[in-house]
Amino acid sequence: MKTQLAILLITLVLFQMFSQSDAILGEIWKGIKDILGKRGLNDLSDLDELFDGEISKADLDFLREIM
């Protein structure tokens, strides 16, 4: 019984540490974004160009073959 209680307490402490570290890291990231501003983070929008939402005829043919 003592071992189970110890494991439960250790687990609760670890979960609490994880949730607090997530909040701290979020605030640090928010501060970094505020320091850099929108001009510094404009390069991150270039990742949107990697995804092409259009489906080509070859893609449709391949999907039909699979079905």
Swiss-Prot record:
<keyword id="KW-0027">Amidation</keyword>
<feature type="modified residue" description="Leucine amide">
    <location>
        <position position="36"/>
    </location>
</feature>
<protein>
    <recommendedName>
        <fullName>Spiniferin</fullName>
    </recommendedName>
</protein>
<keyword id="KW-0964">Secreted</keyword>
<keyword id="KW-0165">Cleavage on pair of basic residues</keyword>
<keyword id="KW-0929">Antimicrobial</keyword>
<keyword id="KW-0732">Signal</keyword>
<keyword id="KW-1053">Target membrane</keyword>
<feature type="propeptide">
    <location>
        <begin position="40"/>
        <end position="67"/>
    </location>
</feature>
<feature type="signal peptide">
    <location>
        <begin position="1"/>
        <end position="23"/>
    </location>
</feature>
<comment type="similarity">
    <text>Belongs to the non-disulfide-bridged peptide (NDBP) superfamily. Short antimicrobial peptide (group 4) family.</text>
</comment>
<dbReference type="GO" id="GO:0044218">
    <property type="term" value="C:other organism cell membrane"/>
</dbReference>
<dbReference type="GO" id="GO:0016020">
    <property type="term" value="C:membrane"/>
</dbReference>
<keyword id="KW-0472">Membrane</keyword>
<dbReference type="GO" id="GO:0005576">
    <property type="term" value="C:extracellular region"/>
</dbReference>
<keyword id="KW-1052">Target cell membrane</keyword>
<comment type="function">
    <text>Alpha-helical and amphipathic peptide with weak antimicrobial activities against both Gram-positive (MIC=41 uM to &gt;82 uM) and Gram-negative (MIC&gt;82 uM) bacteria. It has extremely weak hemolytic activity against human erythrocytes.</text>
</comment>
